[in-house]
Structures are given as structure tokens and as C-alpha cells.
């Protein structure tokens, strides 16, 4: 690739989130920052594609994704290729770092700010000497890890906490744990209020009413699969639509798929997600309550408030103190609470009534806060 003209206002984002039709925090904030600053150029480093793993699993779809893709006049996505496991030493990390450095050089990025969400890029970011912001969105120290993975993550995060120009967290729990040794910036999640309140047609793959809808990633550390199965067994007349990527163990996915009234609809384009929530008889949040979920600031909490649909949730962080239309109940009462709401005449009537306005933080507000942090870190890096 021929090096591009030099770009002075630039950002390298090392993210745990893929770049695709499913938009999460980092991707959304990048979109907002680019919209706010007409001079900003971004290199978005998506999770590395593990070549041996994908071949071993026979999954070829990710292998077909372009290594380098221009997705916007000022946004380029790099999908690094990972050929070696980290267990054999630093070679794998060095190979990934070289791919990022080469892409930044080819794009002509000058002294970019490095926004780290994937802590495995800690040594790369700090070795460059470029200003760095560490953005902690989940407490992966509390997730299911092997001892080797946990030790590596602890080392990477300790380096970032000690040497980053700023540390941003998205939840009060993360502010407490990561703020024990240094100052942190709390920037929670948000929502595109206009998108979620603008009426959309009923999605063609949404099952007929009555239907309970869950929107979000199905994940072993946060999704209560037995609770979903309990709901399906107790209410065979209720369709349950699970909208989002499926990262469950294969056995759990198969248990859900085996039930006729449970529909695994997979990931949906971000701009179509509101339609699933707007046409739900009820939105359900069957989350596990554990140390990992206590660290989260669920984006879906903001989306539920914006959409205004009746919602039943387990007492998970981010939902407990929201109030109507969010009904929080313990796990033992979850199925009964869903049944009572579905059977309520007001549930059907409410679908035709616009949601009462609620004050909900927007992604633009969160991006403005993030931009302030980044500008402060940039300024500090050039101060005499």
C-alpha cells in the first residue's frame, strides 16, 4: 500500500468489539467522534482473526473478511491475522503489533492517540510513546478464564493502569475496582433516543404475539439459560425471541434451539433492533447476577428506557433503580412476573401508546465526555 498523506488528527482504536452491523459502545463512540470532528481519522483495530483456531473449527466466514477495509472516508478497519498462540511467548503479540504499526504508517497517522479497549495491546500502545487512553468496559478478570489467561490479563491491565494517560470505565463497579490505585473517568453507556423512539414496522422474523424479546449477546457469563428454559416450559403459549450474537457453549445453544417456542434470531443490524423491542409484548432480561455482571453497565438498559416497552429483569446491575417500565424481580419470581405482565390487558394496549418520555443519556453526550478526556491526554503528552 502506498503511504497516505500525513494525518495529524488521528486515533488508533484497539477494540474487543468486531466492526460489523452489530454496533456496540466502542463502535458507536467512534462514529460519534468522527461525526463531531471533520479532521479526525481513525484506524479501528478489530479482534484478531485466529487462523489456526478458525481452520480447526471449520469456520471460514471470518477468514474471508478483508484484512484492511475502508468503511468511511476517514475510518479504516484492520482485522489482524493471528498465526501463533500467546502461550508460546511474546511472538504472537509482536506479530499483531507489527500489523497495527504497518497499517498506521500506511495511513499516514502522525502521533495518534491510542484508545485501548483490548488490554492485550498494552505493551504495543505504551512502547510507541503515543498518548494512551485505557477504556474498561467489562471486568474480564471476573469472567471464565484459564489460569494462564487470567495471569496474562492481570499483567496487561496492571501496565495500562500504571502508565495510561487516562483510564475510562463505564460502570460504578469498575470505578471502584479500577479506581483503587489511580483516578478514573466514569463514562457510562447511552442510547440513540431518536432511533429507539421512531416507530418501525414489525420485523418479518419476529414471532407472532404474545412474544417476549431479549436483545443482546448470549454469553455464558451473563445469560441465564435455565431461566429461559423455565419460562418456555411454564408458558408454552409465549414465543421467546432471542435477538443477538450467540456466544454460548454449543450444548446451551442446542438446548435453547430444541424448544419450539424459543427463537434464536441471531445478530441484527443496529438500526433494525428498535423494531424488535417496539413490537414485543414484553422485553425480558434473564441475566445471571454474579460478580461479572455486577461490573457491567448494560447498553440494553438505556435502550429499554428509550423504547418504553414493559420489561421484566432479574436484579442485575444497571437495571435495579430505573423504575417504570422496568420491573425488577428476583430469579425465583421472574417467570411469574413475566406471566402476570403478559396476561395483563394493559400489556397489549400499551403497544399502541407512545412511550412516556424519560430522560436518557445519549451517545452524543457520552462521546463529548470521551472527547474531553482524549483532548486532555493529548495536551498532557505535548506539555513541556
Per-segment meaning from a language model:
Residues 24, 220, 271-276, 283-303, ...:
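Nucleotide-sugar-dependent
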Residues 173, 187-199:
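Carbohydrate-associated surface elements
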Residues 250-274:
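Nucleotide-activated donor-binding/catalytic signature segment of Leloir-type glycosyltransferases, i.e.
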Amino acid at each position: 500500500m502506498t503511504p497516505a498523506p500525513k494525518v495529524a488528527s488521528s486515533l488508533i482504536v484497539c477494540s474487543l468489539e468486531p466492526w460489523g452491523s452489530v454496533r456496540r459502545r466502542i463502535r458507536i463512540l467512534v462514529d460519534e467522534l468522527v461525526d463531531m470532528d471533520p479532521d479526525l481519522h481513525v484506524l479501528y483495530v478489530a479482534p484478531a482473526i485466529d487462523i489456526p483456531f478458525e481452520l480447526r473449527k471449520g469456520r471460514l466466514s471470518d477468514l474471508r473478511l478483508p484484512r484492511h477495509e475502508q468503511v468511511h472516508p476517514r475510518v479504516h478497519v484492520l482485522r489482524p491475522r493471528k498465526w501463533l498462540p500467546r502461550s508460546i511467548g511474546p511472538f504472537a503479540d509482536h506479530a499483531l503489533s507489527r500489523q497495527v504499526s504497518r497499517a498506521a504508517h500506511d495511513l499516514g497517522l502522525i502521533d495518534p492517540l491510542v484508545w485501548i479497549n483490548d488490554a492485550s495491546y498494552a505493551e504495543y500502545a505504551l512502547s510507541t510513546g503515543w498518548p494512551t487512553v485505557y477504556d474498561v468496559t467489562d471486568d474480564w478478570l471476573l469472567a471464565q478464564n484459564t489460569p494462564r489467561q487470567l495471569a496474562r490479563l492481570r499483567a496487561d491491565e496492571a501496565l495500562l493502569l500504571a502508565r495510561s494517560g487516562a483510564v475510562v470505565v463505564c460502570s460504578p463497579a469498575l470505578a471502584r475496582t479500577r479506581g483503587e490505585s489511580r483516578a478514573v473517568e466514569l463514562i457510562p453507556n447511552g442510547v440513540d433516543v431518536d432511533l429507539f423512539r421512531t416507530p418501525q414496522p414489525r420485523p418479518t422474523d419476529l414471532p407472532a404475539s404474545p412474544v417476549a424479546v431479549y436483545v443482546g449477546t448470549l454469553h455464558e457469563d451473563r445469560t441465564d439459560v435455565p431461566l429461559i428454559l423455565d419460562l418456555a416450559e411454564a408458558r408454552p403459549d409465549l414465543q421467546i425471541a432471542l435477538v443477538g450474537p450467540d456466544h454460548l457453549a454449543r450444548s446451551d445453544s442446542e438446548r435453547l434451539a430444541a424448544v419450539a417456542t424459543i427463537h434464536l434470531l441471531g445478530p441484527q443490524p443496529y438500526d433494525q433492533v428498535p423494531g424488535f423491542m417496539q413490537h414485543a409484548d414484553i422485553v425480558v432480561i434473564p441475566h445471571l447476577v454474579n460478580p461479572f455482571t455486577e461490573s457491567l453497565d448494560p447498553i440494553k438498559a438505556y435502550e429499554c428506557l428509550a423504547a418504553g416497552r414493559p420489561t421484566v429483569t432479574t436484579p442485575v446491575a444497571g437495571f435495579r433503580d430505573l423504575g417504570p417500565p422496568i420491573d425488577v424481580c428476583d430469579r425465583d419470581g421472574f417467570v411469574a412476573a413475566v406471566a402476570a405482565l403478559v396476561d395483563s390487558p394493559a400489556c397489549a394496549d400499551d403497544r399502541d401508546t407512545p412511550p412516556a418520555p424519560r430522560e436518557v443519556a445519549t451517545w452524543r453526550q457520552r462521546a463529548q465526555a470521551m472527547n474531553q478526556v482524549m483532548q486532555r491526554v493529548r495536551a498532557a503528552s505535548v506539555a513541556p
